Amino acid sequence: MRSAQVYRWQIPMDAGVVLRDRRLKTRDGLYVCLREGEREGWGEISPLPGFSQETWEEAQSVLLAWVNNWLAGDCELPQMPSVAFGVSCALAELTDALPQAANYRAAPLCNGDPDDLILKLADMPGEKVAKVKVGLYEAVRDGMVVNLLLEAIPDLHLRLDANRAWTPLKGQQFAKYVNPDYRHRIAFLEEPCKTRDDSRAFARETGIAIAWDESLREPDFTFVAEEGVRAVVIKPTLTGSLEKVREQVEAAHALGLTAVISSSIESSLGLTQLARIAAWLTPETIPGLDTLDLMQAQQVRRWPGSTLPVVEVDALERLL
């Protein structure tokens, strides 16, 4: 016997969260809970404004239609990425296809303060990895901050994310202020320039390795080994089903590229599932999941060690 519930939710964000030049005041999304006999599976559907093609209202419509079809015996996944991902997670939990083991190590997001980062990294076992958003301020400032961090913490490796913010000139301005002796400790810089060709040129000219992120979701993208390209950053909410995520990870690994499972600012429920996916598909790589503290609450499932209050399922708006 099958049954299902769909919940709508909204979490207040911290005041300083800006995505693509727009302030994100709340994180809006949906949960689906599927039951079959004694088994249960949950999934999160939370399109990311400015990044997802679909709105959460559109996702809600597709999700409700899919749930009704599933209750009638149809299991074909929807095409909409955020819905396909959430639904496939719920189905995977339902059938025990998503392992319970999780990688809760997260590359901490750094605001540029080395003292703050040293404290965050003190308890981190193994490789010291942190992430810095660049491209929000002047490229020269970004270069100076990155150089300062690498100089202050000799065993640090940084992941940088520019979200295609730079022109070739700005990329050169950034690199000018990063000591060439430190550049090998930049694990990768995600999508530095507005076009892939400009990003490739940046890697060749600076010796700083790059990673593809947005490019993975463009129709003309293919997985190929290229000079200067070290990694791909996979955001499952923006990608689609678990099977598609696994295919991308396997394609990257086949070329010797690092694959990083990364957050699209999901709630704690979605983040704990991403931690399980990372442990399953990319066990040797620290995932990019340090986004929970951008929110003012957790929901349904707790992230280990978080002190944020938890909203239980009974407090959510039930749609089905």
From Swiss-Prot:
MF-aspect GO terms: magnesium ion binding; O-succinylbenzoate synthase activity
Enzyme Commission number(s) of this protein: 4.2.1.113
Binding, Mg(2+): D161, E190, D213
Any one Gene Ontology BP term: menaquinone biosynthetic process
Cofactor entry: a divalent metal cation
Reaction(s) the record says it catalyses: (1R,6R)-6-hydroxy-2-succinyl-cyclohexa-2,4-diene-1-carboxylate = 2-succinylbenzoate + H2O
InterPro entries, alphabetized: Enolase-like_C_sf (IPR036849), Enolase-like_N (IPR029017), Enolase_C-like (IPR029065), Mandelate_racemase_C (IPR013342), OSB_synthase_MenC1 (IPR010196), OSBS_N (IPR041338)
Pfam families: MenC_N, MR_MLE_C
Pathway(s): Quinol/quinone metabolism; 1,4-dihydroxy-2-naphthoate biosynthesis; 1,4-dihydroxy-2-naphthoate from chorismate: step 4/7; Quinol/quinone metabolism; menaquinone biosynthesis
Keywords: Lyase, Magnesium, Menaquinone biosynthesis, Metal-binding
Active-site residues annotated for this sequence: K133 (proton donor), K235 (proton acceptor)
Family: Belongs to the mandelate racemase/muconate lactonizing enzyme family. MenC type 1 subfamily.
NCBIfam families assigned to the protein according to its UniProt record, in alphabetical order: menC_gam_Gplu, PRK05105.1
Family annotation (HAMAP family): MenC_1
Protein purpose: Converts 2-succinyl-6-hydroxy-2,4-cyclohexadiene-1-carboxylate (SHCHC) to 2-succinylbenzoate (OSB).
Designated name of the protein: o-succinylbenzoate synthase
Species of origin: Escherichia coli O17:K52:H18 (strain UMN026 / ExPEC)
Highest classification ranks of the organism: Bacteria, Pseudomonadati, Pseudomonadota, Gammaproteobacteria, Enterobacterales
